[in-house]
């Protein structure tokens, strides 16, 4: 599971870089609601990545120990997305729904880019 932890921390670092860029955008541009929405969505997306990594670790340990396998936490990730939607709908003067949804998708985009980057890097080393 060390490889999973390394991948997780690499992806967290990328997401934190994006959050820093969004924070700069919030502070220095007139698009405050857009960047605040991106910050909200990406922050919740970061929680989703942490939750997914933790559940995958527990899942792997249960399989290795031949114990009963639990779910991977889809319901908890859906609840986090619903929480973001409730916040956006409660405070429409501060948030927009589209940038929040884009922020929620950020972790999955980072995972895909990270996968292809490391696949390309490993293929380059083996060639």
UniProtKB/Swiss-Prot annotation:
It is a multi-pass membrane protein. Its main location: membrane. GO terms for biological process: proton transmembrane transport. It is found in: Cell membrane. The chain crosses the membrane at residues 11-31, 34-54, 72-92, 97-117. InterPro entries: ATP_synth_I, ATP_synth_I_Bacilli. Keywords: Cell membrane, CF(0), Hydrogen ion transport, Ion transport, Membrane, Transmembrane, Transmembrane helix, Transport. Disulfide bonds: none annotated. One of its GO terms (cellular component) is proton-transporting ATP synthase complex. Belongs to the bacterial AtpI family. A possible function for this protein is to guide the assembly of the membrane sector of the ATPase enzyme complex. This is ATP synthase protein I. It comes from Bacillus sp. (strain PS3). The gene is atpI.
């Amino acid at each position: 599971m060390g490889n999973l932890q390394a991948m997780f921390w690499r992806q967290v670092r990328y997401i934190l870089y994006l959050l820093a860029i969004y924070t700069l955008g919030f502070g220095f541009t007139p698009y405050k609601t857009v960047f605040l929405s991106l910050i909200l969505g990406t922050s919740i997306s970061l929680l989703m990545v942490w939750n997914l990594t933790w559940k995958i670790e527990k899942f792997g340990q249960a399989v290795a120990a031949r114990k009963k396998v639990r779910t991977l936490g889809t319901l908890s990730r859906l609840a986090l997305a619903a929480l973001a939607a409730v916040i956006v709908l409660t405070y429409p003067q501060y948030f927009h729904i589209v940038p929040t949804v884009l922020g929620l998708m950020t972790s999955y985009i980072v995972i895909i880019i990270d996968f292809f980057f490391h696949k390309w890097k490993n293929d380059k080393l083996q060639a």
